[in-house]
């Protein structure tokens, strides 16, 4: 009888001891947290607000792929010089990879070549620097996108009329590739082409206002979202406003498209662009030196088709 009582007391106690040991040791928990990959993200302009959806895609990819992002935004007037300094600093700090949105392809090529040769991989977004050693470029086919915008503007600008192209890029980028392609299409179709460039530190709105006082364009074309937003803000509500076309799919751009201030836009999935860019940077950090990525699809969207399901995904992305 005593033995039976003893067993009844000891067995539960042993069970509790085993349970306690299992809880304290927790074999399912790694003894040390897995180290995150460090990826530095360098924007090309001081105002990065138009990259907000792409940034959400980057952050989601970082969460999914066990990476940590450091966002760096140039603050000075010489964007290329500041990006060079940031590239060198981040490479020296030991970051695992750099995601670069170049402000000037030619000015940054040597720096990219030097740091990639020294072992820090670089992936670019929007502007291709693979010839300088970057592992990959994520973005649309800029020439095709520019041609599409040029063809769209042909519909609103009669033969012989003037089309003004907004030129705010400080150097050679994917944005200037778009502009060059659009200009070639317009000139081949018998349209006059002018360019609007800010001078002496003026903003784009002032430059466009100045341009409109001396020119009477039938259409204006912008080649990135920031320029398109500013042009739309200036032209909104003006009775004599030229037709406005451009690249970009921000919430502000969508609002102006709905109001018919913007006639047509070339839009791509910005969330996907950001996600794929970080994914490529993770691949590069893992040792894949170079790899080919298909260009991102873009779509021409007008007010009348902006609420079609596929276009809604571009203009009003649902993020996790």
Language model features: what each stretch is:
Residues 8, 272, 276-320:
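Hinge/cleft segment of the Venus flytrap/periplasmic-binding protein
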Residues 39-56, 61, 70-81, 105:
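Extracytoplasmic "Venus flytrap"
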Residues 138-162, 249-253, 269-286:
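Hydrophobic alpha-helical segments within soluble ligand-binding/sensing domains
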Residues 99-116, 199-254:
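Hydrophobic alpha-helical
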Residues 94-102, 121-125, 163-167, 193-194, ...:
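Periplasmic-binding protein-like
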Residues 8-24:
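Hydrophobic membrane-insertion alpha-helices, especially the h-region
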Residues 70-92, 194-214, 228-230:
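Structural motif
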Residues 107-144, 250-258:
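Flexible loop/hinge segments that line or gate small-molecule binding clefts
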């Amino acid at each position: 009888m005593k033995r039976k009582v003893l067993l009844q007391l000891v067995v539960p106690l042993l069970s509790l001891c085993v349970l306690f040991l299992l809880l304290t040791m927790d074999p399912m928990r790694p003894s040390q947290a897995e180290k995150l990959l460090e990826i530095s993200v360098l924007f090309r302009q001081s105002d990065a607000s138009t990259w907000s959806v792409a940034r959400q895609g980057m952050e989601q990819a970082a969460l999914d792929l066990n990476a940590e992002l450091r966002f760096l935004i140039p603050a000075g007037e010489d964007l290329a010089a500041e990006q060079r300094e940031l590239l060198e600093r981040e490479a020296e700090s030991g970051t695992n990879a750099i995601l670069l949105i170049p402000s000037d392809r030619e000015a940054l090529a040597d720096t990219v070549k030097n740091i990639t040769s020294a072992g820090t991989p670089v992936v670019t977004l929007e502007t291709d620097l693979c010839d300088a050693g970057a592992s990959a470029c994520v973005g649309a086919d800029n020439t095709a996108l520019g041609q599409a915008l040029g063809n769209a503007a042909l519909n609103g600008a009669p033969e012989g009329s003037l089309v003004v192209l907004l030129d705010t890029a400080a150097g050679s980028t994917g944005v200037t590739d778009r502009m060059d392609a659009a200009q070639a299409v317009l000139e081949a179709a018998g349209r006059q082409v002018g360019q609007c460039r800010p001078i002496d530190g003026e903003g784009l709105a002032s430059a466009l206002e100045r341009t409109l006082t001396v020119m009477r364009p039938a259409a204006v074309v912008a080649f990135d979202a920031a320029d398109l937003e500013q042009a739309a803000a200036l032209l909104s509500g003006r009775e004599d406003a030229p037709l406005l076309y451009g690249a970009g799919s921000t919430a502000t751009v969508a609002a102006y498209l709905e109001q018919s201030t913007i006639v047509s836009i070339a839009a791509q999935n910005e969330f996907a662009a950001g996600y794929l860019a970080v994914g490529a940077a993770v691949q590069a950090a893992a040792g894949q030196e170079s790899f080919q990525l298909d260009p991102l699809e873009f779509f021409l969207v007008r007010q009348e088709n902006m609420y079609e399901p596929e276009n809604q995904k571009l203009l009003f992305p649902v993020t996790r």
